[in-house]
């Protein structure tokens, strides 16, 4: 659609297609949020209740690519100001991990002093087996995600705490 509009009206509109986004002010509702904010909330509840297990949906092998919201915002500004010959550009990190790997990383960052066992609820769906974007075009134009994962998790978690306890 952008391409047709650009051809007809001589505009330079671009469509950026982001991968799964996370960060401050996300939706952490247990039933209608995406897996990552739901996982942050679940880990927080385990931390509060001093639980020794976390249960995640499916077998934990579904793969997801994530991008921190600040990187996505930076990409939007970058490409608004960049002359490009393509109307659709995927925005992401170009790397994915399993749900289990993300769970392990979040546990290590948010509850570093405790060993929590990951259990799998096989009665729940795994979701799409893999969600990973080809970000080679964004890289070709000089854009890459820059945010440190651990720092972005801490910032996101602090936002979750503010959102949850300052209502």
What is the meaning of each model-derived region?
Residues 1-19, 35-50:
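Active-site Tyr-X1-5-Lys
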Residues 28-32:
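Active-site loop immediately N-terminal to the catalytic Tyr-X3-Lys motif
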Residues 20-24, 62-63:
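A short, flexible beta-alpha/helix-coil linker loop
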Residues 24-27, 137:
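Short beta-loop-alpha junction of Rossmann-like oxidoreductase domains
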Residues 39, 45-167:
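C-terminal substrate-binding subdomain of Rossmann-fold SDR/epimerase-dehydratase oxidoreductases
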Residues 19-20, 152:
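Conserved beta-strand edge residues that scaffold enzyme active sites
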